[in-house]
Amino acid sequence: MAAVLIVVLYCIPAYAETMTPEKQKQLNEYYQQAWKLLGQMHKDTSNLDKAYAFYQKALAIAPNYDKTYWKIAEISFKKAQEAKDDAASKKLYHEALENAKKSVALNPNSVEALYWIGTCEAKLAELAGIFKAMGLVKSAKKNLKKSIALDPDNRFSVLARVILAILYTEPPWPLRDLGEADKLTAKAVEMDPNLTLSSVKRARVLMKNGDNELAKKELQRCLNIKKPTYVWDSELYDWPEAKKLLSQLK
């Protein structure tokens, strides 16, 4: 059930052309191995540590390549989601945030790094309490919007729309903006119908707006997706959430 590998993820950075062909090949292999392991985290979460080890090897070859840092941020973020308590999660989200910032320091226009910065900030704000972390919420929105603006069709821009929608859906009034959340989730579902995260969050927005029948249809569609974009997220988080929401609507 592994998700289809996206070849562009393995491209070698432009400056790496000065490296030997052997080193270029090795860097590419590290990325492929790490991606495969991430794609199997739903079967064994220890694969995250194994993927992290490959990215550390990639850093040893190309220590100033921005892409590796946001990929390490992704691993820390996933580990935070699986952590046993809030303290452990918070530490890992901070680690992810710092690595994403390192990526942006090397490449200020990294769509992926800006997405991870915004997403980590959103999670840290959630752990702290929205009203106690207004600065984080504001920064998260700014970084997510910039990620989208830089490359609206990038797969991370699709994800950024969903995280932005969550920031507009979950907080209490007056921070809530269900109209904006509706637009963002509708666009995300349109851009990637197989992204279960956008589907389940779209259903949440519909429920908040009182459109329970449409929410049911979206949840059923989510659960019937045969080839989810990220099968690990679908199995660990999105499908269980969809089932829970659907049970509330029956």
What is each stretch, according to the model?
Residues 10-67, 216, 244, 250:
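Extreme N-terminal leader/anchor segments
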Residues 19-21, 29-53, 72-109, 115-146, ...:
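Short coil/linker segments at helix-helix boundaries
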Residues 202-250:
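Long, ordered, amphipathic alpha-helical scaffolds
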Residues 185-187, 199-204:
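Short, local alpha-helical segments
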Residues 2-10:
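Bacterial N-terminal signal peptides
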Residues 193-199:
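Alpha-solenoid helical repeat architecture
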